[in-house]
């Protein structure tokens, strides 16, 4: 009987999935808005992972040596277009990296950490 309940929950989640994906789709107009926001707030758009998830980052994060090493390693694996900053890193790991940089809990050498975070 427990399997039936799990299957029902799974079906329910699968039905909601398409509407969830539609709500989180970025259009070119939203990209233009994010460009305007980045200019106004001095934030930079960074695209992370294979899905190219956008992040708005402050200049102090962008200029950090570890972040610069990630961008350098990523640029050899991806094609940069129109000044876009692309980081070849899993999104979950990138969020951990941001937490480390913001909290000042960086440990280890820049090269070792960059190798850990990039794919």
UniProtKB/Swiss-Prot annotation:
InterPro entries documented for this protein: SAUR_fam (IPR003676)
Cytoplasm keyword on record: no
Keyword Acyltransferase tagged: no
GO term, biological process aspect, one: ethylene-activated signaling pathway
Keywords of the record: Developmental protein, Ethylene signaling pathway, Growth regulation
Its job: May be involved in the regulation of ethylene receptor signaling. Promotes cell expansion and plant growth.
Sequence similarity: Belongs to the ARG7 family.
Note: Plants silencing SAUR78 exhibit increased sensitivity to ethylene, while plants over-expressing SAUR78 display reduced ethylene sensitivity. Plants over-expressing SAUR78 exhibit increased rosette diameters.
Record-given protein name: Auxin-responsive protein SAUR78
The organism of origin for this protein: Arabidopsis thaliana
């Amino acid at each position: 009987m427990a399997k039936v309940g799990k299957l029902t929950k799974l079906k329910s989640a699968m039905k909601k999935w398409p509407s969830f994906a539609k709500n989180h789709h970025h259009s070119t107009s939203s990209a233009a808005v994010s460009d305007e926001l980045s200019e106004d707030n001095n934030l930079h758009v960074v695209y992370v992972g294979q899905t190219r998830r956008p992040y708005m980052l402050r200049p102090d994060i962008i200029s950090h040596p570890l972040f610069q090493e990630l961008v350098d390693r990523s640029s050899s694996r991806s094609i940069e277009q129109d000044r876009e900053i692309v980081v070849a890193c899993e999104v979950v790991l990138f969020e951990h990296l941001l937490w480390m940089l913001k909290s000042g809990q960086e440990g280890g050498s820049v090269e070792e950490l960059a190798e850990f975070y990039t794919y």
